[in-house]
Structure formats: C-alpha cells, structure tokens
Amino acid sequence: KETAAAKFERQHMDSSTSAASSSNYCNQMMKSRNLTKDRCKPVNTFVHESLADVQAVCSQKNVACKNGQTNCYQSYSTMSITDCRETGSSKYPNCAYKTTQANKHIIVACEGNPYVPVHFDASV
C-alpha cells in the first residue's frame, strides 16, 4: 500500500521541472500521476523544488492547518509551484485543467518518523 509520504510525492512533487512547461502541463500531469483515475480531482498543486527542500518545511514555521490541526508548516521562502484547477467544461473521464504558475510559500502537514510532508494544505 502507498504510504502517506509516497502519496504526497506522487500528488505534489515535480522536482524535474522548474516550472510548468506549457498550458497543457496540468492535463498531462494530473493524468500521469493517477489523479484522474476514479474522478477528476478538482484542485491540485505541484511543487517544482527538490524533495529535500520540501521535506525541510516540516522544521520551518509552525502554523494551524485549514482543518484546525496544528501539524502544518509554512515555508520560510517562496517556492515555484503550479496550481491545477478543473475547468468548467471538464467532465470525467476527460478531465480538463487550467495551469497556473506561481511563486508562493507552501503550507504542508507533516507526520511520522522521519517527520515528512503528508498533505498539501495551502499556498500563500
């Protein structure tokens, strides 16, 4: 079974590119990472930084998560991210996404030993 940490990497990490390559980036990535298998995942963020840099956020600024839990952490520096948002015309199984590139601070929830990101909470 996929671990929470591995799921975070599959859903949110794209260290191989420094930014979204094209407007078609989200359509390709959401499909290749199996985020459109059973339904169209409405919103998803990919982080274009090294895994080590993203894992390091777990020892940075402790903040409250959206759901009220206290195991969220905000990155000290901005990171290159791509937001994927489902378009109005998107219909499963033909999921369609708008690709938006940004440089923002990320907020992730961390747990486990080693203490690693398991959930992408927000970008600010």
From Swiss-Prot:
Domain of life, per the record? Eukaryota
**Primary location recorded for the protein, binned into one broad class:** secreted
This entry's Gene Ontology molecular function terms read: lyase activity; nucleic acid binding; ribonuclease A activity
The cross-references to InterPro entries, in alphabetical order and at most eight, read: RNaseA, RNaseA-like_dom_sf, RNaseA_AS, RNaseA_domain
Q: Where is this region: Disordered?
A: 1-22
Mind telling me which CDD domains this protein's record contains? RNase_A_canonical (cd06265)
> Per its UniProt record, what SMART domains does this chain match?
RNAse_Pc (SM00092)
Q: Which UniProt keywords apply?
A: Disulfide bond, Endonuclease, Glycoprotein, Hydrolase, Lyase, Nuclease, Secreted
Give EC number(s), comma-separated: 4.6.1.18
GO CC annotation terms, alphabetical? extracellular region
Binding residue positions for substrate: 7, 10, 41-45, 66, 85
Active-site annotation: 12, 119
- Please tell me in which tissues this protein is expressed: Pancreas.
**Main EC class the enzyme belongs to:** lyase
Biased composition annotated in UniProt, kind: Basic and acidic residues: 1-13
Q: What does this protein do?
A: Endonuclease that catalyzes the cleavage of RNA on the 3' side of pyrimidine nucleotides. Acts on single-stranded and double-stranded RNA.
Q: Per its record, how is this protein called by name?
A: Ribonuclease pancreatic
Q: Which organism is it from?
A: Bison bison
The record's gene field reads: RNASE1
